[in-house]
A protein has these predicted regions:
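Soluble extramembrane regions of membrane proteins in the secretory/endomembrane system
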Residues: 1-192
């Protein structure tokens, strides 16, 4: 759809670098699931979602996005440590909602792992840290539109990527890393 295409072409400032939303979302989906797309069941049948569609659903339809099985877990030790439901597949996929149910276990595990330091971590410990980081990114996306509506100044204190609209030639909207104080990511997304 045109909306997804336009959203994917917008620029986002992430970690001091300007990149297209499609690249930003694609990187996060690849890091979270190990793929650049995934299939979900809908009332109309199976549907393939792109990284941009996933990110937009997280931001504007979190009740759907939290059910998508996008968190890949490769190690049984991680499943056991976080008390996740077992699955037959070797490469297990969990939803945000399933991980949220185990948030306390995940937080406890992350705290214990961080006390050990960065060196000599097992692959399972590294996977838990990665899982928690990816969970936090998705949680941020799911909260971003609510935060911007309820308390826009909170965005200044948080490390969310930012989209900035600016006027282009003939009044056309362009996207840039040079912020206009009056507009933020929500307004940028809403103007699509």
């Amino acid at each position: 759809p045109a909306l997804v295409e336009r959203a994917g072409a917008m620029a986002v400032l992430d970690g001091g670098r300007l990149k297209p939303v499609s690249t930003y979302a694609g990187f996060h989906l690849l890091r979270t699931l190990g793929k650049r797309s995934f299939v979900v069941d809908t009332p109309e049948g199976k549907r393939k979602l792109s990284p941009v569609e996933w990110m937009l659903d997280c931001m504007f339809r979190p009740e759907l996005a939290e059910q998508y099985p996008v968190f890949l877990v490769n190690r049984e030790e991680v499943v056991r440590r976080l008390h996740l439901p077992d699955q037959k597949d070797k490469r297990k996929k969990y939803s945000y909602a399933q991980l949220a149910e185990r948030w306390e276990e995940m937080t406890r595990a992350v705290r214990e792992i961080r006390l050990l330091g960065e060196t000599n971590l097992t692959e399972a410990q590294k996977e838990i840290l990665s899982l928690a980081r990816n969970f936090d990114v998705m949680r941020g996306w799911m909260l971003v539109s609510r935060i911007m509506l309820e308390n826009p100044s909170a965005m200044e204190r948080m490390e969310f990527p930012r989209w900035f609209p600016s006027a282009g030639r003939d009044g056309e909207r362009l996207w840039t890393a040079a912020p206009d104080k009056a507009a933020g990511a929500f307004l940028a997304m809403a103007s699509l």
